[in-house]
């Protein structure tokens, strides 16, 4: 591990090869340890019981709840991941990810929305910007929503429970 600054590391955490941990809190127990792996850059974030952050994840200003897995170059900014989320390869910005939210495609971008029991298809993309005005809108994808490969949602939007978006 190259750099750990201003970081509270719980007794049962394992940090192995992280690039940088700065202003973070890693909360663990003997029954549910936190694992931080190779190449991880984490700034101003909280990582909770039983979570693993591995394989060059980049994260800032985020909260990772219990038993979450972030891996394979996933990038997160200003986002919340609650219990049992699985995020791999893609990106999240200002995402409120409820329990069991999953994204594992390189081209998926979760932005400005609330998710729960959500499965992001490959190349899923959200837009919440108006030209030159910055982010304006946010949306809700209710419990059990799935977006198909290449899905594009323009916010504001509310997608109902157990819906599939093409």
Give residue ranges: language-model regions:
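Active-site pocket-lining segments that scaffold enzyme catalytic pockets across diverse folds
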Residues: 8-9
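Glycine-rich hexapeptide-repeat left-handed beta-helix
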Residues: 16-19, 24-61, 65-166
């Amino acid at each position: 591990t190259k750099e750990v600054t201003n970081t509270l590391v719980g007794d049962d955490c394992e940090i192995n090869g992280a690039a940088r941990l700065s202003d973070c809190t890693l909360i663990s127990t003997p029954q549910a340890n936190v694992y931080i792996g190779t190449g991880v850059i984490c700034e101003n974030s909280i990582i909770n019981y039983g979570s693993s952050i591995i394989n060059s994840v980049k994260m800032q200003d985020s909260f990772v709840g219990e038993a979450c897995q972030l891996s394979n170059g996933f990038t997160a900014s200003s986002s919340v991941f609650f219990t049992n989320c699985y995020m791999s390869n893609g990106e999240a910005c200002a995402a409120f990810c409820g329990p069991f939210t999953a994204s594992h495609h390189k081209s998926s971008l979760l932005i400005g929305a609330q998710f729960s029991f959500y499965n992001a298809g490959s190349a899923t993309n959200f837009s919440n910007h108006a030209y030159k005005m910055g982010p304006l809108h946010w949306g809700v994808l209710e419990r059990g929503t799935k977006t198909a490969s290449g899905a594009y949602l323009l916010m504001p939007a509310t997608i109902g429970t157990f819906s599939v978006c093409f």
